């Protein structure tokens, strides 16, 4: 990989297990424009420490793309009991997506990673994704 001209976007997250998110990219194919780590906070329970959400944008083949690299909070403590944490993560992503779409309605957005749930969970509903068999429309997110 050292010869591949790769770049990486990474920072240590507050996760106690040392799990982080990162974006690995080829510098000769993708021009990184911006990177930010969205910190998830849980004032209701300050003992919760989870992975940040990585937001990065860049240019690929003259198109600007926006990436969200996610590893939503785990189901520790039970799926239903911990769902609100994943909903908070989804809400954080959705808020940033909405702010991007307000400026650029046809923005190319990719949300990827481990969302710790199925397509029909409450957290997925917060994201507002639609089935990928629907006709694409601006400002919609699709599951694939």
Labelled PLM ranges:
Residues 1, 12-16, 45-48, 81-89, ...:
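Extracytoplasmic/periplasmic, Sec-exported soluble proteins
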Residues 4-5, 79, 121-124:
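Short, well-ordered secondary-structure micro-motifs
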Residues 16-18, 75-77, 116-122:
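Active-site environment of divalent metal-dependent phosphoester hydrolases
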Residues 30-31, 58-66, 95-106:
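Secondary-structure boundary elements
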Residues 63, 68-85:
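Active-site His/acidic residue clusters
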